[in-house]
Amino acid sequence: MSYFIICTVAFAVSGLTLFSGFGLGTLLMPAFALFFPIEVAVAATAIVHLTNNIFKVALVGKNANFSVVFKFAFPAAVMAMVGALLLNFFTTVQPLVQYVSAGRTCTITPEKLFIATLIVVFAVMELSPRFENLSFDAKFIPLGGALSGFFGGLSGLQGALRTAFLSRAGLEKEAFIGTMVVSAVVVDVSRLLIYGITFFSRDFEVLKSQGGVGLVIAGTLCAFCGAFIGSRLVKKITMRTIQIVVGIMLLLVGLSVGSGLI
């Protein structure tokens, strides 16, 4: 079941992220969180996210506007490291509440509450028409990079903010997509450096012992397939129905994470 869930999410969402407001991590991180601790889920998602985005760079990276990439990705990289360090700090904090539900021990930690809040906020953004065309003036691109990078490093959730701030950069569709992909690679490399230095080396045994390495590889391959098919077959997709489904799923996952069920 774990392979089915991870592979299905990675394949479906990877193709759609070329054209949609949400990113691969928005759904893949909660999917990994069903089977692993939050910090391991975030790091595992980052590996799939990075390798998938490198593949996307090969497909569409030549269209990127590197002037915009520099303005957005430099502050994003710095703040991604800050967010990743904060995530590491959260892993050292003692649980707030522990309880038993249906014979299973559920734990509520500050880390889970914070990430659950972010997931619910992104769910509301997906569900509300008010945020459907959310965008910011081009002068705020560095600020957008900083915010997107910070939340990417902390939770893996960054796609919606990246889209909102880059959509007003005056780029054609091809340049817009290429710029987003290259910027995402910069953020992924930055946060993975911190994950590797801090908790991921410590928690890798958790991933390995529970079959997570195979899940990461399978998720990566399925994400490659989804990105390839998406880049070849999809020209323009109306995302509203998909956004509603995504929003509902995120809302349920956010509530489950916040309550300690996940």
Language model features by range: what are they?
Residues 35-38, 73-84, 141-154, 187-189, ...:
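Small-residue-rich segments of transmembrane alpha-helices in multi-pass membrane proteins
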Residues 66-77, 136-145, 178-181, 242-247:
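Cytoplasmic-side transmembrane-helix entry/capping segments in multi-pass membrane proteins
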Residues 38-44, 67-71, 170-183:
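Membrane-interface alpha-helices at helix entry/exit sites of multi-pass transporters
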Residues 1-36, 126-180, 217:
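Selected transmembrane alpha-helices and immediately adjacent juxtamembrane segments
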Residues 3, 46, 116-119, 123, ...:
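Residues within membrane-spanning alpha-helices of integral membrane proteins
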Residues 2-3, 32-50, 106-117, 146-156, ...:
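Structural signature of hydrophobic alpha-helical transmembrane segments
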Residues 43-102, 189-237:
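Selective hydrophobic functional segments
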Residues 53-59, 84-96, 112-137, 228, ...:
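Transmembrane helix exit motif
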